[in-house]
Amino acid sequence: MCRKDRFSNIAFSAAHKSVQRYKHGAIATKNGKVICEGHNDGMRTKVLNNYRSCAHAEMVVAEKIIKMLKKKYGKNYKNYTNKYTIWVVRKSMHNSNEKNLKMYESKPCYYCTKDLLKEGFDKIGYSNEDGEMVVQRLKDIDTSQLHKSVLQLQTEKFY
């Protein structure tokens, strides 16, 4: 099993712990080793000093890494966040059948991408629309498209 598959499987397992409808799981790795894991949480929470309506899995993991690095390096923690890769996947079930578990798109949203960049993270692995893992530098993610989709979601009316 290649590294990408191994990491996506671990993040997929973390997603199972989520109680949200869209289950996202994430891990942080360094030098091929899993450092921590997390999943999305629907509770209003403070992530990286910003209050959010929910905590996205990648931000839960980033918060854990930052907390660990701040303890060790203090204010200089941002000099070390680029050594970690965050992996995030979205797990979904069709027909509520455990056999039909699949990975779906989990590309980080506009806000998560911006926050991760601001904190000095460099790379992220995420499941694409085909359920395959993509590894990309955060600075190469087209946030204009992500922002557009977030704005569309905010203006949609749900009846």
Language model feature labels by segment:
Residues 1-22:
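Short, basic/aromatic recognition patches
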Residues 18-25, 106-108:
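Gly/Ser-rich catalytic serine loop of serine hydrolases
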Residues 23-37, 125:
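Short beta-strand scaffold segments in enzyme catalytic cores
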Residues 36-159:
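Zn2+-dependent cytidine deaminase-like catalytic core
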